[in-house]
Amino acid sequence: PMLRGLYTGWTGMVNEQKRLDVISNNLANADTLGYKQESVSSQSFDKLLTIKIRDGSQSYHNQAIGTMSLGVKVGEVYTDYSQGSIRGTSSPLDLALSGSGFFTITTTNAKGETVTRYTRDGSFQLTKDGYLVDSQGNRVQGSGGDIQIDPNAKDITIDNSGRITVDGEVKDTLKIVDFENYDYILKTGDNLYRVVDGATETT
């Protein structure tokens, strides 16, 4: 019983530590553009049947006398995708998504492969070659792939539908996608998300 009590207390401390880790991460990213905060749920371990082993005063069969729990465990760490605040800037390349959806970008993984990722962070800029990139230098995707704009253009506008107009000429449209079920997208760091098997993309 004493060991069981210690174990139950230990599970509570582990659960509380995970909750504090999640809160600390949310606070550290309070000013991160496009960041979605996380929360953690808790649940009890499955209850075990408690049995009184027969002794001289009991009948031959062991007797069930109730159930007991062995403490608490982390149930799920989940992301809150509700709309965050939107701040205006003077840059025509600073964008924000109102409602659901993600910008599509490409990046390079540890194997050197080009992979697709998704982000809510719309703080974009142009490289010296005119590619539209995010704050990490990953290329933003349009309907035709990488978006390239004349870096010397005098007038760049992006309307509410994601259509990019450069000096009066439509160049491309941002590839903005959404997913039927957010349980199939995972955070990968640097404010990016990836999809897992089963994800259904919508546009």
Please provide the spans of the model-predicted regions.
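Amphipathic alpha-helical polymerization modules
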Residues: 1-203
